[in-house]
Amino acid sequence: MYRLCLIATLALSPALALAQTAPTTLSCDGAFAKDSDYARIVKIFGAANVTDEKIHSVGVGEIKATVIYGKDAKRRLEVVWKDEKARKNPFVMAKGADSAWKTEDGIGGGASVADIEKLNGKPFKLYGFEWDNGGLVSNFNGGALAKRKGGCFLGLSFSPPDDVGAELYKVSGDKEFLSSDRNMRAVKPYLWQITIGWQK
């Protein structure tokens, strides 16, 4: 019995080791470089931690995605391939205020607009809430976050808290607001999605 347990443990250990040591950093190189592909994702995170699923895309519906740590809500990461047939050129999404994923400069789920404004070095623009692109940062206004080391782009989306009041309607709709807008600050939106990808 002991021998069987030992064999099972040894068989699982590579996947466990990868799960424990694989990074949770969103950067323009390594696993998520422009030339990355499905094989590289599997090599870095382990086959046991990588699955193919269908996810919901706003305004599109269900799309195919490669999911890393699909059973772990905090470490779950969704990868959509720009070259779907070859599964190359990743578009990567970390969702949720409690996501373990962070960018190299420390941007993580749950951050406030003030937190991101500080990292950007100046106010940025984001769309109003209550529509498909609600809360999406539309322009970093030439701030520090406008360009990423390595050349990929950074996408950020904010969400209002569940208990938000009538003040939400002052910053809703298909129009842009500054992160420094007093009505936007009053809503206290939090960062719920971080995206990195490539324009071409």
Regions found by a protein language model. Give the residues of each.
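Positively charged n-region of N-terminal signal peptides that target proteins for export
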Residues: 1-4
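Short helix/turn-capping signatures at newly exposed starts of structured segments
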Residues: 18-133, 137-153, 157-200
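N-terminal signal peptide c-region/cleavage motif recognized by signal peptidases
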Residues: 12-14
